[in-house]
């Protein structure tokens, strides 16, 4: 599940928090929380989801949030009975009007935690901000609301608090509300959210058994909107059950300038790993997501900027892993590289039987890109 980053920008006048909104937009934040009179100003800055503190349906925000200036933030005393809470009544009324509703609660003590658990059952989002706590109330609320259709957004001040919130009780909050003016903190927190919940892949050594030129064919070059570094590339193979880590063109070469956004991935028939699924290389197009993987198995999402399919001389590479042979067909050129067991790129022109390269092997078959349990032989 993707984790989301909200930027809190409701204090002071517009110019005081415009910069943090702009930084959030540029860094890839998902939502901005502002006062109701600033919704349109945010929309003028860029395309981002807007949440607004309000008690009516006139703001035009994507998400209306109750609690500021009410019981949620402690401005007004809590009602002895949550059912009689003005925030609760307002949230229900706005939901009945078909709006997406959030509740904002500052957890000052146990009673506020209990109030948050109750109002959360009536809302689409529950935004909780701590005073002197780190984990326990969040754990309690995740447990209390696990059967409710509400997304918990935890207030944080930096990337370390964000990481803690997003990983609490394995599931973590669905997102965080960041309250910071520091551009570096905003960027680092967005990066934490992008990595959160994405498990490392287990890459293993595969022993090369064959390297053979196979003639001319069509190969796919994937130019992404992302800069890759040494050790990064994409998992590509002729079988979905076993894929080679094909290195990006991030290394300098005497033959051509580096292209750190590019992976010369393989022939048109090949599979490429995208999240938990696979796709054919030849299906990729601008705007599609791909998975960038490094030699240690860490994953991140990339965006396809362009795909080039061109006729080139090809080379078959086979490797043995777990007693099985896996294959890939790559362009026969010095700049096309796999990754050795030390995380170093190795050119297919230098590849020989007996070399060990990093591969991803899981066995099993695929049906429309999804893993299924069935007997299948791919040669």
Curated annotation (Swiss-Prot):
Pfam families: DHQS
Keyword NAD: yes
Gene it is expressed from: aroB'
Top EC class of this enzyme: oxidoreductase
Regions crossing the membrane: none
Lineage of the species this protein comes from: Archaea, Methanobacteriati, Methanobacteriota, Stenosarchaea group, Methanomicrobia
GO molecular function: 3-dehydroquinate synthase activity; dehydroquinate synthase activity; NAD binding
Family in the record: Belongs to the archaeal-type DHQ synthase family.
Catalytic reactions of this protein: 2-amino-2,3,7-trideoxy-D-lyxo-hept-6-ulosonate + NAD(+) + H2O = 3-dehydroquinate + NH4(+) + NADH + H(+)
Record-given protein name: 3-dehydroquinate synthase
Organism listed in the record: Methanococcoides burtonii (strain DSM 6242 / NBRC 107633 / OCM 468 / ACE-M)
